[in-house]
């Protein structure tokens, strides 16, 4: 069964072009030009990945992203017409997993789609039974079910946040560099990410875990090196 991709962009030429390239890769595509149509699709259809334009008339792509994150954990890629840190950081902060700036190469977008889907599937249930649960100081990560609990309360994490936390816990006691996190999460399809990308995801993780940068209980910053979770 082919993966189902949602594409929302009011620029018909871009949406149609992305649809063409996705279908050439045998994906099932739900294409919409308005937020209203997209929100109806989200409520009634099974989606594996969403591609959302930030600048939509009426309801923005950021609002759609937030509504998706209220119920779903599948990857979200944001399309932005502005190459600014504010747009990118805002998207990542509210739950997006990746972004790409217009104009973009269709093949680059397809590569990112494949990378996000591969990572999401990998971390959603491929470990052996005796390796699928990570437990540490009140934190429980189930790799198979893609669920995370802190002090018996479930955390709502994006796929990228889940991956970062899993990697840090699997390497607890050791410093994990931003470069290694980049490689583990985005793989060979990593292109030109901002240096702030991992920082934003870490900050969002800390907020959800009620952790602080000054006196962290879980995620510690080792300045100039990376991040670690103490044993």
From Swiss-Prot:
Cysteine-cysteine disulfides: none
Modified residues (4-aspartylphosphate): 53
Location relative to the cell: Cytoplasm
Keywords: Activator, Antibiotic resistance, Cell wall biogenesis/degradation, Cytoplasm, DNA-binding, Phosphoprotein, Plasmid, Repressor, Transcription, Transcription regulation, Two-component regulatory system
Post-translational events: Phosphorylated by VanS. Dephosphorylated by VanS. Can be phosphorylated nonenzymatically by acetyl-phosphate.
GO MF annotation list: phosphorelay response regulator activity; transcription cis-regulatory region binding
Chain segments annotated as coiled-coil in the UniProt record: none
Residues within the DNA-binding region(s): 131-231
InterPro entries membership: CheY-like_superfamily, OmpR/PhoB-type_DNA-bd, Sig_transdc_resp-reg_C-effctor, Sig_transdc_resp-reg_receiver, WalR-like, WH-like_DNA-bd_sf
PANTHER family linked: REGULATOR OF RPOS (PTHR48111), RESPONSE REGULATOR SAER (PTHR48111:SF2)
Protein role: Member of the two-component regulatory system VanS/VanR. Binds to the promoter regions of target genes, including vanH and vanR; phosphorylation of VanR increases binding affinity to the vanH and vanR promoters significantly. DNA binding may be inhibited by the cognate sensor protein, VanS. Activates the transcription of vanH, vanA and vanX in response to vancomycin which results in vancomycin resistance. Involved in conferring vancomycin resistance.
Name of this chain's protein: Regulatory protein VanR
Originating organism: Enterococcus faecium (Streptococcus faecium)
